[in-house]
């Protein structure tokens, strides 16, 4: 796997599942992770929110930016990408 230290990943659906697993793996290399997901409140049957994911990513060694995004709405995606680029100085990798 390439070195992801200092790289910025924008990951949709990173609050749980495969998205979170990818984020935590990249965080171990020191990556910056923008967590783009809808989950801000705990679900009764599914673990994780964008905030708990951010904690896990930072515990793994990365930097996290939790963003409330519903990918069905282009304006929300564009706003989140703009926020990510401003916060981390750009976006290197997009995972949807």
Spell out what each predicted region is.
Residues 2-89:
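Short-chain dehydrogenase/reductase
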Residues 92:
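Conserved acidic residues
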